[in-house]
Regions:
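Conserved short "hinge" loops at termini or chain/domain junctions
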Residues: 1-58, 102-121
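Short loop/turn elements at secondary-structure junctions
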Residues: 15-21, 66-68, 72-121
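Short, mixed-charge amphipathic alpha-helical segments
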Residues: 55-67
């Protein structure tokens, strides 16, 4: 999934006035968490988030297509926090965390290290 598509999907869920660079910065927090779990280098955002008119590079996000919902659910929850809508934030945050946990569990299952047969008890 591309970053700008995740932002558009979140905007469809929660119309807001937050600038695209700031939304990209919010998504990078989740992307760094995912990169750390994967053991990959975390991508960097090449835009000045203070400049609300700056264009954001449309980079590919780390999670594959089956787990794209993590990004727009997480961003929607953060938009609820930004809008100070605590009731929606609590629900959306729980849903987003569940989606991220499922995606991370899937990744760990699919990318498990080869067992050497040595067990320590």
């Amino acid at each position: 999934m591309k970053m700008l598509k995740a932002i558009r999907d979140a905007d469809a869920l929660r119309p807001n006035k937050l600038s695209t660079p700031r939304k990209a910065e919010i998504l990078m927090v989740l992307e760094h968490r995912i990169a750390e779990m994967m053991g990959a280098e975390a991508p960097t955002l090449k835009v000045n988030v203070e400049d609300d008119t700056a264009s954001v590079e449309d980079m590919e996000l780390l999670l594959p297509d089956g787990h794209n919902e993590c990004y727009h659910l997480y961003l929607a929850a953060q938009l609820d926090a930004y809008n100070q809508d605590s009731a929606l934030y609590a629900n959306d945050h729980a849903i987003a965390n569940e989606a991220v946990a499922n995606a991370m569990a899937w990744w760990r299952r699919e990318n498990r290290k080869e067992s050497k047969g040595n067990w320590k008890v």
